[in-house]
């Protein structure tokens, strides 16, 4: 059985001044979908980080780029896909360069860079990366935590 959803697409120039448009549109969409204030704040941070990563890393200021933000609104979740057609990267190599984060590490002493994906993975219920023509980050947030628990049970059994 196919799952139905509404889809909203936002096409942004890959420039820092447009990151806020992705965040603002997400806020309205998530509110309409029924997310709590706290969940909306988490979503806004994660999507801002994903768009900022595309602006900073995919195009590196050398070329005019474009970022596509797609919001897929389901009955029980919101899926956000941030895609660019810029330079791709190897996540595992990047993790090796950055190294692991220690729980007791002072935030002021953490290395600059590399926190974007860490934040996204922490704030969202599911995150997937795709490397086609550029990079796509697909982030999923369930509308209620009960759904997260149900999914966790089905995965572990």
Curated annotation (Swiss-Prot):
Record's function text: Negative regulator of sigma-B activity. Phosphorylates and inactivates its specific antagonist protein, RsbV. Upon phosphorylation of RsbV, RsbW is released and binds to sigma-B, thereby blocking its ability to form an RNA polymerase holoenzyme (E-sigma-B).
Reactions that this protein is recorded to catalyse: L-seryl-[protein] + ATP = O-phospho-L-seryl-[protein] + ADP + H(+); L-threonyl-[protein] + ATP = O-phospho-L-threonyl-[protein] + ADP + H(+)
Top EC category: transferase
GO-annotated molecular function: ATP binding; protein serine kinase activity; protein serine/threonine kinase activity; sigma factor antagonist activity
Xref: InterPro entries: Anti-sigma-factor_SerPK, HATPase_C_sf, RsbW
EC number from the UniProt entry: 2.7.11.1
Domain of life from the UniProt record: Bacteria
Gene (UniProt): rsbW
Ranges in a coiled coil: none
PANTHER family for the chain: ANTI-SIGMA-F FACTOR RSBW-RELATED, SERINE-PROTEIN KINASE RSBW
Name of the protein described by the UniProt record: Serine-protein kinase RsbW
